[in-house]
Curated annotation (Swiss-Prot):
Enzyme Commission identifier(s): 2.5.1.75
Alphabetical UniProt keywords: ATP-binding, Magnesium, Nucleotide-binding, Transferase, tRNA processing
GO biological process annotation, one example: tRNA modification
Gene Ontology MF term list: ATP binding; tRNA dimethylallyltransferase activity
The keyword tRNA processing is annotated on this UniProt entry: yes
Entry similarity comment: Belongs to the IPP transferase family.
Summary of the function given for this chain in its UniProt record: Catalyzes the transfer of a dimethylallyl group onto the adenine at position 37 in tRNAs that read codons beginning with uridine, leading to the formation of N6-(dimethylallyl)adenosine (i(6)A).
Disulfide bonds: none
Protein's name in the database: tRNA dimethylallyltransferase
InterPro entries: Dimethylallyltransferase, IPT, P-loop_NTPase
The keyword ATP-binding belongs to this UniProt entry's keyword annotation: yes
Positions annotated to bind substrate: T17, A18, S19, G20, K21, S22
Subunit-level organization: Monomer.
């Protein structure tokens, strides 16, 4: 078994949903005595294994997988939290002689992993919860107006309906008395040196990708996605919770309420996935430079 630890510090694999990147990660991890590390912001949650395409035990093929399903559904989990988890994990992988193989479709995770993350301040949980509660109860308009008084330049740069970003800007201003823009220009430490990593972006043919997406969403319903969403609803998650925004949740909720047929769920769920994949493809083409290998799987 070949081990690349002496020549590269990690393998990074990204690409759109349903591109085959997870299978590629397992293949490379088996070849190079590696361990797969999740870099997908939805697959961190302990719910929706099927709907977020979290690898099954069979798909893992005995390869160690890390940072999958380790976050409670209702918990806040940021790019910074992911980086902290990665930083805590890497020494153990190194000690075990395992090459980290990062795989996922969250481009910001890879940018932060190789370029550092803005050094944002810690926010008191009581303040964060207070602002989130206001967002749920009042909507974003009043919070945006409040931000416009406290930080006019930042308020002007944000979409008035982007509640999460408005809350983030407000909580930083309230906690520190300074604009979030003051912190965004400061980067934290780089965890993976991009120059010493093998970097792969999987960009399949569009027609092939769409065919995979259509088939996969139907398979998800067959494998229990409906039961997953029913269990999620039983947790009484707020609508703003990130896990509630996973692709397919809103369509399946509509079906459970009798507002959509199974056929409509398949059609609309697959369409939403195709739109998401298109946004991912555009982002990767624009953000991943020539040092990233382009592969079709």
């Amino acid at each position: 078994m070949e081990n690349l630890l002496s020549t590269v510090n990690a393998i990074l694999i990204t690409g759109p949903t349903a591109s085959g990147k997870s299978a590629l990660a397992v293949e490379l991890a088996k070849r190079h005595d590696g361990a797969v590390v999740n870099a997908d912001s939805m697959q961190v949650y302990d719910t929706l294994r099927v709907l977020t395409a979290r690898p099954s035990k069979e798909e893992m093929q005995g390869v160690p997988h890390h940072l999958y399903g380790h976050v409670p559904a209702g918990a806040a989990y940021s790019t910074g939290a992911w980086l902290r988890d990665v930083s805590a994990l890497l020494p153990a992988l190194r000690d075990a002689g395992r090459l980290p193989v990062f795989v996922g479709g969250t481009g910001l995770y890879f940018k932060a992993l190789t370029g550092g993350l803005s050094d944002m301040p810690e926010i008191p949980e009581t303040l964060r919860e207070k602002l989130r509660t206001r967002l749920l109860q009042e909507g974003p308009d009043g919070l945006h107006a409040e931000l416009a008084v406290a930080d006019p330049a930042m308020a002007a740069s944000l979409n008035r309906q982007d509640g999460q970003r408005i809350v983030r800007a407000l909580e930083v201003m309230k906690a520190t008395g300074r604009s979030i823009a003051d912190f965004q220009g400061r980067s934290g430490p780089v965890i993976i040196d991009a120059a010493e990593a093998r970097k792969i972006v999987v960009l399949p043919d569009r027609a092939v990708l769409h065919q995979r997406i259509n088939g996969r969403f139907e398979k998800m319903l067959q494998q229990g996605a409906e039961d997953e969403v029913r269990a999620l609803l039983a947790l009484d998650m707020p609508a703003e919770a990130p896990v509630m925004k996973a692709i397919g949740v809103s369509q399946i909720v509509a079906m459970l309420r009798g507002e959509m047929t199974r056929g409509e769920v398949l059609e609309k769920g697959a369409a939403a996935t195709r739109q998401y994949a298109k946004r991912q493809m555009t982002w990767f083409r624009n953000q991943m430079d020539d040092s990233w290998e382009r592969l079709t799987v």
